Amino acid sequence: MDQLYMTVQDYLLKFRKISSLESLEKLFDHLNYTLTDDMDIVNMYRAADHRRAELVSGGRLFDVGQVPQSVWRYVQ
């Protein structure tokens, strides 16, 4: 039986319920500590970085992989 992974989009939708960087970091730390599957961890990291970019751009939403390069300089 194949294991089902949460996709980047799945994690992004979960992270979009959060409107502050502080709360995002709390959820990120929790998931980072509890996830064990490498694919899930990679997808979660990608989605968290994506959400950080959305938050630093004033809450503007971007499709996965479509964050403007100019926004990334503000993501820590």
UniProtKB/Swiss-Prot annotation:
InterPro entries to which the protein is assigned, alphabetical: Hemolysn_expr_modulating_HHA, HHA_sf
Question: Which species is this record about?
Answer: Salmonella typhimurium (strain SL1344)
Name used for this protein in its record:
Transcription modulator YdgT
Under Gene3D superfamilies, the record lists: HHA
Family classification: Belongs to the Hha/YmoA/Cnu family.
Where are its TM segments located?
A: none
Keywords from UniProt, A to Z, are: Transcription, Transcription regulation, Virulence
The record, for SUPFAM superfamilies, names: Hemolysin expression modulating protein HHA
The protein's role, per its UniProt record: Binds to H-NS and modifies the range of genes it silences; H-NS alone silences 'core' genes while the H-NS-Hha complex (and presumably also H-NS-YdgT) silences genes acquired by horizontal gene transfer. Plays a role silencing virulence factors in the absence of factors that induce pathogenicity.
Q: Which domain of life is it from?
A: Bacteria
Entries under Pfam families matching the protein: HHA (PF05321)
For the null mutant, the annotation states: No effect on expression of pathogenicity island 2 (SPI-2) which is usually repressed in culture; derepression of SPI-2 in double hha-ydgT deletions. Double hha-ydgT deletion mutants lead to deregulation of many genes at least 2-fold, most of which are also deregulated in an hns deletion, suggesting there are a large number of hns-regulated genes whose expression is also modulated by Hha and/or YdgT. Upon infection of C57BL/6 mice a single hha mutant has 10-100-fold reduced virulence compared to wild-type, while a double hha-ydgT deletion is 6 orders of magnitude less virulent.
Cysteines engaged in disulfide bonds, as pairs: none
